[in-house]
Each structure stands twice: as C-alpha cells, then as structure tokens.
Amino acid sequence: MNWTLGKAERKDSNRINELFIEMLQTIYNTKQVNGYSDGDLDRFFDGRDEWISIALDDDNIIAFLSIEVHHEDEEFIYLDDLSVTKQYRNNGIGTKLISNAEAYAQEIDIRTICFHVEKSNIAALRLYERLGYAIHEDQGSRYLMIKNI
C-alpha cells in the first residue's frame, strides 16, 4: 500500500464526514448515526492552530485525524475523531497520523497530547496504549487518555 499524509482543505469536508460516519457506525455498531452538522469543520480551515491531518491513497482520502491546539492554563493538543476507512485498517495509518500530530506538538513546543476513547473501542484503546498513552480519567463510557512528549 502506497499512501501519503497531507493537510485537509475545505473541499475535503464531505469525504471527512463520510469517514466520521463510518467511524461512528463501527464504534456504536449501528447505521443510525449522524455526521457533522453544517459548519462543524469550518474551524479547521480558517488558518488557526486547528487542522485535520489526512492520509491519501492517490487522491482518495482514506483516513483523518482532527488536531486541536488549546492555549489554556496548561497548553495541550487534543486529538479528535481519528478514522481509518475499513479496508485500510491495520496498516499503520492511524499510528502515522498520531505520530504526525506528536511531531507537530513538539514543533510548536506543546508537551501534552490528550483525547477520549470509547471503552467499547478495544482496538483503538490497544493502539493508544501501545503508542504510550495512559488512561488519565474514567469518564463513564469513555476514557480520557494522555501522553506527555
């Protein structure tokens, strides 16, 4: 498999929404899910710190990871909505997207990365633990996971 990483543009919103729906259907084991609402992705394309990393096979988006930079009392990067389309899973794409986000965090001198993972998403939980993320807080149906880099 020959895929590359890139940065999403506004024109990629529909495909990103399709992958988001696919992710939700997998996690919740139902077809009855809603995608992003109109305008939900706009903040990732307005030139601020937030952006979406994508994996491409030729010109087809096969995966994405939303990256949010938070400048609060403690600065951190929040990783949101990682989705790899089914036929490309278990090929290191999710790992590469996360590694890309970690490199970005180091580039902008932010040392903490966190995200939420559904407890039922065992494959994702194993991946994150393998990459050095630890459960920081049990929040009912999901965990808050953190890694200091």
Question: Could you say what each language-model-derived stretch is?
Answer:
Residues 12, 81-83, 87-88, 92, ...:
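Conserved functional loop/turn residues at catalytic and ligand-binding sites
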Residues 64, 118-119:
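Short amphipathic helical patch at the helix-1/turn junction of helix-turn-helix
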Residues 84, 90-103, 126-130:
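Conserved acetyl-CoA-binding loop-helix of GNAT-fold acetyltransferases
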Residues 98, 105-116:
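Conserved GNAT acetyl-CoA-binding A-motif
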Residues 144-149:
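Terminal substrate-recognition subdomain of acyl/acetyltransferases
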